[in-house]
Swiss-Prot record:
Domain of life of the native organism: Eukaryota
Pfam families, A to Z: Spc110_C
Subunit structure of this chain's protein: Homodimer.
Family statement: Belongs to the SPC110 family.
UniProt source species: Kluyveromyces lactis (strain ATCC 8585 / CBS 2359 / DSM 70799 / NBRC 1267 / NRRL Y-1140 / WM37) (Yeast)
Role: Component of the spindle pole body (SPB) required for the proper execution of spindle pole body (SPB) duplication. Potential role in cross-linking filaments or anchoring other molecules. It is essential for growth.
Record's GO cellular component terms: cytoplasm; nucleus; spindle pole body
Name assigned to this protein: Spindle pole body component 110
InterPro entries: Spc110_C
Key word Zinc present: no
Length: 858
């Protein structure tokens, strides 16, 4: 036969009566005890389990058993050492054997809860811990009774004190014997010394010697103190001498360094001065060459005059063309004004003509209407009007022709204007080309030389400024070094010599500048003289030329000089702009290079960060693997714990039997001590027995103490290692947290499973209840229909029943209905609370597992 699959806890389902709300009353054969135990079990089941589970979930790592431990200690501190019969007399309601009851309960729970092995193992582990604790308490109580040990468990101290007491007793006896022997010897010596007469003298001499000894000791102490002081002073003086020597050596090194620096700087200044002298000589040579070039330029200025004359002629032609252009523009503007006036007149004439035509048409119509009255007059009038009309049409045609002529004249004028403008543009272009050619021809002779001169002057000024700044900085440094250096006089002499040289150089530079100014003034004077001589020669060559021509030539020359000046200024501005753009380009290039460098640095930093992150990922992976291995090991340990459960039970049984044996022996010893209270021999025998037992216990405890001390040392070493290696502590913490999370996950899934089982059971019961209600209601409806069919008469089609005679039974509410309602409300409240608590616990565990935070409480 195939077994039907059922959900766990299916046996807990209750049998319901056909009642509207609530549980069914249990059968009478189950008894009153079953009703007490199972009456509200299903509704309060989850609520009763809540506190224990809540405590365990709040603090999973540490099991707090303070209340149970104090209770057990109070119960079994002294009573456990007394035989069982006496304990039962004192406490008739107490249990005989705690371990047996615990084992039986454990077996019952394992039989009942086969579907939840995790809970079973946890409960068994808790019970084993409790049993172990009880056994420890019993052992401590026995030790207290036997050896009068304190509550703190100070076993070793008491044993050591007892050993010391025995040793002290033995020593006391020996000392007493030695003291008696010494007393006897002293008595003998005194008896012998009474015979001698020189005892007083010996005593006096002995006292003097003692005083001398004391004085010598005091003197020795004083001399030792003085010696110590002298040694300290010598040490301090030696330290001071050593420090002074080190400072002196350091100062000597610093002075040597400063002297070397000064010598190097003096050498640098001498080299720079020689280089400057060379530069000055080069500049003089350049000035001479420039003067020669200027003279050559003055000789070549004759060819420029022809060019200037051609330029003047072209300029005059351009001016004439510009004047013609202006005239043409004025004519065009006047013609445009006339055209606009004519157009206005034409429009006004057209309007008047239209008005006249309309008026005449109206008159013709009137005349045609009045033909019958005045035909002859009308015909005449008509002829006149038609003649007038023809005349007006001819005038209109003539006006149109005049308008066309005006338009043609305007077009011709515009064409002339455009041609003039084109000629002007062409002449301007030619003029520009000729000017540019002239400038190009003059440029290699003038601009290059002038620019070279300017650049050389600028360089000279810059070098002079740099020399001044260097001289100032050198003088400041030299002053500072002279103030600090020990060899002051020699350095001052050197500085004065250098200053004199610098002054001489400055004077030479000033002389050179004056010479340059004189040369420039001479060049300008020579140019003026040259011009005057050229003018005189021209006058001599052609004296017939009028003064006006000469004045115009001078004007042209002045204009050429102005143009050259403008050209030079344009070139200067161009050069400045080029320099500015070059600076901007250099700044942009530098910024670009800096940005590229920053980008490279950032990329390097990012690559370093990436490498670090990769290393961290590898470390985390290794840690994850280690945690997985630890998890597997923990799971193996858990399986081992489950397997060793039976072994623990057997060990508990053995410990229990041993405890019973110890209590029996204790009872026997107590009986023997009561029987042998009177006889001294029996007391000695008992004392010997106790002493032998004491010795055996002492040896055992000492062995245990040694083992515990070794363990303590090992633990201390491991603790020190853990402090040295913080990674190990982190691993331990991770292990503990992993255990905590494992426990939380187990609790979470166990709770969820229990809730789902309860829900399924509730749904089953509801389904059964509703099916029963439907069946019963259908049966009642069928019966009611049959009754109605039988009761309603056939002859009365409208069922005319006298309703006023019917009695309606107003029954009172029974106590049973009220009680059932109250019971249902209470049960609803308890179920809602249990449901809410379960939901809260599930949410708490879920958050704790997801966030991995043990600090969260609910």
């Amino acid at each position: 036969m195939s077994s039907v699959m059922e959900t766990p806890h299916a046996g807990k389902l209750k049998k319901y009566e056909f009642t509207p709300i609530g549980y069914a009353e249990e059968k009478r054969k189950e008894g009153i005890d079953l009703l007490k135990e199972n009456g509200l079990k299903r509704s309060l089941e989850s609520g009763s389990d809540l506190p224990a589970e809540r405590k365990r979930v709040r603090n999973p790592s540490v099991v707090d058993e303070t209340f149970s431990s104090t209770r057990l200690f109070n119960d079994t501190s002294f009573d456990e050492t007394v035989p069982e019969g006496i304990i039962q007399e004192r406490r008739p309601n107490s249990r005989k054997n705690l371990v047996d009851d615990l084992l039986i309960k454990d077996q019952e729970t394992t039989e009942n809860l086969t579907s939840n092995p995790l809970k079973e193992t946890e409960s068994s582990l808790k019970k084993l811990q409790m049993e172990n604790y009880n056994l420890r308490i019993k052992c401590t109580s026995l030790l207290k009774f036997l050896n009068n040990i304190s509550d703190d468990g100070e076993i070793v101290k008491n044993l050591e004190i007892l050993d010391e007491l025995d040793d002290l007793k033995v020593r006391y006896r020996q000392l007493n014997l030695d003291y008696t022997a010494l007393q006897k010897q002293c008595d003998r010596i005194e008896d012998q010394n009474d015979e001698h007469e020189d005892i007083a003298k010996l005593k006096e001499s002995n006292d003097k010697l003692k005083e001398e000894l004391r004085s010598t000791k005091e003197n020795l102490i004083d001399t030792d103190a003085q010696l110590q002081q002298l040694k300290d002073t010598i040490k301090s003086l030696e330290n001071k001498i050593f420090n002074m020597r080190t400072e002196q050596t350091e100062k000597e090194c610093q002075h040597g360094m400063q002297v070397d620096l000064l010598q190097s700087k003096i050498n640098e200044t001498s080299t720079s001065l020689t280089s400057k002298e060379r530069e000055c000589s080069d500049l003089k040579e350049k000035i001479k060459w420039l003067t020669s070039q200027l003279q050559e330029f003055d000789h070549q200025s004759g060819s420029l005059l022809d060019l200037q004359s051609t330029l003047d002629s072209k300029n005059e032609a351009i001016r004439n063309l510009e004047a013609q252009l202006q005239r043409n523009e004025h004519q065009r503007q006047s013609l445009e004004r006339e055209v606009s006036l004519l157009q206005e007149e034409l429009s006004s004439i057209r309007e008047t003509h239209q008005k006249i035509i309309t008026h005449k048409d109206q008159q013709i119509k009137q005349l045609t209407e009045n033909l019958s009255s005045s035909d002859s007059e009308a015909v005449k009038r008509l002829n006149e009007l038609s003649s007038e009309r023809l005349r007006l049409l001819e005038t209109n045609k003539s006006l149109k022709f005049s308008e066309k002529d005006l338009k043609q004249t305007v077009k011709s004028l515009e064409d002339q204007l455009n041609s003039c403008q084109e000629e002007l543009h062409a002449s301007q272009d030619k003029h520009k080309e000729k000017v540019s050619e002239l400038l190009r021809k003059q440029l290699p002779y003038t601009s290059s030389e002038v620019e070279a001169m300017r650049q050389e002057l600028l360089e000279m000024r810059k070098s002079n400024d740099i020399l001044k700044t260097e001289n100032n900085s050198l003088s400041r440094r030299l002053d500072n070094l002279i103030r600090q250096s020990p060899s002051k006089k020699s350095v001052e002499v050197d500085i004065q010599r250098k200053n004199n040289e610098i002054r001489a150089l400055r004077s030479t530079v000033k002389d050179l500048e004056h010479e340059l100014q004189d040369v420039t003034s001479n060049v300008s004077k020579l140019k003026e003289n040259h011009k005057e001589e050229i003018q005189k020669l021209r006058k001599q060559v052609n004296p017939d030329l009028p003064t006006d021509v000469l004045e115009e030539k001078s004007k042209l020359q002045n204009r050429i000089s102005l143009l050259q000046m403008e050209l030079n200024s344009i070139k200067d501005t161009k050069e400045k702009e080029l320099a500015m753009w070059r600076r901007k380009y250099e700044t942009i290039r530098r910024s670009n290079e800096e940005l590229l460098q920053e980008g490279k640095d950032q990329s390097g930093q990012l690559s370093n960060i990436l490498n670090e992150k990769d290393k961290e990922i590898l470390q985390l992976q290794s840690r994850f693997n280690s945690l997985l291995t630890e998890k597997n090991s923990l799971l193996n340990e858990l399986s081992k714990v489950r397997s060793h459960k039976d072994d623990y039970k057997e060990e508990l049984k053995k410990n229990q039997s041993r405890l019973e044996f110890i209590t029996k022996e204790f009872v026997k010893l107590k009986d023997a001590s009561k029987q042998a209270e009177n006889s001294e021999d029996a007391k000695d025998i008992l004392n010997n027995k106790w002493y032998s037992k004491y010795q055996s216990m002492k040896d055992k405890f000492l062995g245990e103490l040694k083992s515990l001390q070794d363990e303590n040392l090992e633990l201390q070493k491991s603790l020190l290692k853990q402090k040295a290696n913080p990674n190990s502590t982190a691993e331990v913490f991770s292990k503990t947290t992993e255990k905590g999370t494992l426990k939380d996950e187990i609790d979470y899934y166990r709770l969820k499973y229990a809730n789902e089982v309860k829900q399924n059971n509730d749904l089953k019961t509801m389904n059964q209840y509703l099916n029963r209600v439907l069946r019963a209601s259908s049966q009642h409806v069928k019966l009611d229909i049959l009754k109605l069919q039988n009761e309603v008469p056939v002859y009365n089609p409208y069922a005319d029943i006298p309703f006023h005679n019917m009695r309606f039974s107003h029954q009172k509410i029974k106590f049973k209905t009220v009680a059932l309602l109250v019971l249902s409300c209470i049960r609803m409240k308890t179920t809602i609370e249990a449901r809410r608590w379960d939901r809260q616990r599930l949410d708490y565990l879920k958050r704790k597992i997801v966030l991995n935070q043990d600090n969260i409480s609910w």
